[in-house]
Amino acid sequence: MKIVKVIGREILDSRGNPTIEVDVHLESGFIGRASVPSGASTGKNEALELRDGDKQRFLGKGVLKAVSNINKIIAPALLSRNVFDQRGIDKVMLSLDGTSTKSKLGANAILGVSLAVARAAAEYLQIPLYRYIGGVNTYILPIPMMNIINGGSHSDAPIAFQEFMIRPIGASSFREGLRMGVEVFHALKKVLHDRGLSTAVGDEGGFAPTLKGTEDALESIIQAIDNAGYKPVEDITIGLDCASSEFYKNGIYDYTKFEGTIGARRTSIQQVEYLSELVSKYPIDSIEDGMSENDWDGWKLLTSKIGNKVQLVGDDLFVTNVEFLKKGIEQGCANSILVKVNQIGSLTETLDSIEMAHRANYNSVVSHRSGETEDSTIADIAVATNSGQIKTGSLSRSDRMAKYNQLLRIEEELGDKAFYGYKALKMC
């Protein structure tokens, strides 16, 4: 089935910043549509999104250059291409760009087209996107990692760590896990309200109160879990996204960047010991970016110290790139990869990263970005790849709910064939 038209346009994301939406038209009349997210904290090795830089328009964040690249360069190259040749189409776009970071055409331009192509193919076949991408062996619904307290670059709270998440590991289904998360979210809102703290939400829908520090955030979450009628560890665990690259400089993890004078300054060894101490004290079973993307020795030390009992997720470390993931696997750094489609910039490369991780017995976590749209593609990717885990924000904001609601639909469609969580894959 041939592609007859590709149209790129500028739309707005959940932060009111411009982003890209793409329509791919087929000769049959079917259309695939996709839009592209963007991040607030980014790894230095991520594929580059193309912004206009015109300060007179959207404060320089416009994406008309990337849209033009879609309409004038990518579109002509894809006309009459077979829509089912996803890898070939992505290869054509990568060749047109010709850079390792996709800086010529823009990773946002390439990704928008790549995802829209897959959607168009699924629409033509009249099958769900997760089924088109993953085939017949797709049955794992992901454990949601719900960001309910924001810190770091995602809020103005004086906490260095970027995300405090709950993980409903004790649920029997995605639907139940989502309900558990919602109930804890509302219980936490009451905990914060009763303390006279703000219940305003950040970019990803989590609360951003002026807490005293990391342990205050953890204690507040545990109280909310208890108040909601659940048991820490057995029903719900806690995940952290330290986003350590954001406050790592000259070999030091400088918490004062976000926490002011009360913040500590830690060496790599001290950072490992601090995280190990938190794990021993609280029901934490997942830590993302506990060490900086530039601290590979620190990552090896952390993995050696607690990698046998905690999921250690590489985000900035791996940037969804098989080259960095391969290095991590060889050096024994982390045991899981965070998967962000716009970090690498094409569906093919995203799937390659997940496959490499799973073959090395690394877990994978499919993830949103802080700047999102109503597009729910990552929900389908999580199921398509049997990832078993998804990060798509808190339990508020419609841009986050779009992904959760899509997962509810998928679970309903799979019926009794559905399994819940990444551990289900390893047990089957």
UniProtKB/Swiss-Prot annotation:
Residue numbers binding Mg(2+): D241, E288, D315
CDD domains: enolase
Subcellular location: Cytoplasm; Secreted; Cell surface
Top enzyme category: lyase
Superkingdom in the source lineage: Bacteria
Cofactors (names): Mg(2+)
Magnesium found in the keyword field: yes
InterPro entries from the UniProt entry: Enolase, Enolase-like_C_sf, Enolase-like_N, Enolase_C, Enolase_CS, Enolase_N
Keywords, comma-separated and alphabetical: Cytoplasm, Glycolysis, Lyase, Magnesium, Metal-binding, Secreted
Main location, first listed in the record: cytoplasm
Pfam families noted in UniProt: Enolase_C, Enolase_N
Binding note for cofactor: Binds a second Mg(2+) ion via substrate during catalysis.
EC id: 4.2.1.11
Annotated metabolic or biological route of this protein: Carbohydrate degradation; glycolysis; pyruvate from D-glyceraldehyde 3-phosphate: step 4/5
Molecular function terms from GO: magnesium ion binding; phosphopyruvate hydratase activity
Active site feature: E204 (proton donor), K340 (proton acceptor)
Function summary: Catalyzes the reversible conversion of 2-phosphoglycerate (2-PG) into phosphoenolpyruvate (PEP). It is essential for the degradation of carbohydrates via glycolysis.
Family label: Belongs to the enolase family.
The name this protein goes by in its record: Enolase
Gene (name only): eno
